[in-house]
């Protein structure tokens, strides 16, 4: 079982129940899923770029990503409906907790000039979005083997009803918010 999952059930859930005075244990907010998305804009000209992004994302998450395709044609971008334009992975369960653990304890401290993540990126419904500028912060990615530095969006979907609950949950899980 994932280390962070144990910590959640033994320490974090009781602390959240105490703080927000939940009557029922099912009201306690928890991490539902983590979605990692990599937009590959250059895939319009270079179809090999998608393969590199898929490879990087599968190394980082340990799960095969799904290729996202364009929903509409946009002539200005030379984009047609159905063209591959990115990749994404949805993590749940133990894999999700292991990824979050690695992200917070290994990857984020490797970011240059890191002073914590913004606490303003909540969407009003208890979900948090984190943007990462380069995939090199993950130890699974070797510097010599990448073709291009790519960023990614990481979305933490929680069962929290408010941003305050979600902020408290992620803070207790170890998210390094700016002071």
Swiss-Prot record:
Cellular component terms per the entry's GO annotation: ribonucleoprotein complex; ribosome
Keywords: Ribonucleoprotein, Ribosomal protein, RNA-binding, rRNA-binding, tRNA-binding
Extent of the signal sequence: none
GO biological processes: translation
Superkingdom as given in the UniProt entry: Bacteria
Ribonucleoprotein recorded as keyword: yes
Family of this protein: Belongs to the universal ribosomal protein uL5 family.
HAMAP family: Ribosomal_uL5_B (MF_01333_B)
Function of the protein: This is one of the proteins that bind and probably mediate the attachment of the 5S RNA into the large ribosomal subunit, where it forms part of the central protuberance. In the 70S ribosome it contacts protein S13 of the 30S subunit (bridge B1b), connecting the 2 subunits; this bridge is implicated in subunit movement. Contacts the P site tRNA; the 5S rRNA and some of its associated proteins might help stabilize positioning of ribosome-bound tRNAs.
PANTHER family found in the cross-reference section: 60S RIBOSOMAL PROTEIN L11-RELATED
Assembly: Part of the 50S ribosomal subunit; part of the 5S rRNA/L5/L18/L25 subcomplex. Contacts the 5S rRNA and the P site tRNA. Forms a bridge to the 30S subunit in the 70S ribosome.
Protein's name according to its UniProt entry: Large ribosomal subunit protein uL5
Species this protein is from: Desulfitobacterium hafniense (strain DSM 10664 / DCB-2)
Phylogenetic placement of the source organism: Bacteria, Bacillati, Bacillota, Clostridia, Eubacteriales
């Amino acid at each position: 079982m994932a280390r962070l999952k144990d910590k959640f059930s033994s320490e974090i859930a009781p602390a959240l129940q105490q703080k927000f005075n939940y009557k029922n244990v099912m009201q306690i907010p928890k991490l539902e899923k983590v979605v990692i998305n990599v937009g590959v804009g250059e895939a319009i000209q270079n179809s090999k770029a998608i393969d590199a992004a898929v490879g990087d994302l599968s190394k980082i998450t340990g799960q095969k990503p799904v290729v996202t395709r364009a929903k509409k044609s946009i002539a200005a971008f030379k984009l047609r409906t159905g063209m591959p334009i990115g990749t994404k992975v949805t993590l749940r369960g133990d894999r999700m907790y292991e990824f979050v653990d690695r992200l917070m304890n290994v990857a984020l401290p490797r970011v240059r000039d890191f002073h914590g993540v913004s606490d303003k990126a909540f969407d009003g419904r208890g979900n948090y979005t984190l943007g990462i500028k380069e995939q090199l912060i993950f130890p699974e990615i070797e510097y010599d083997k990448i073709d291009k530095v790519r960023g990614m969006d990481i979305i933490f979907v929680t069962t929290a009803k408010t941003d305050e609950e979600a902020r408290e949950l992620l803070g207790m899980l170890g998210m390094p918010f700016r002071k």
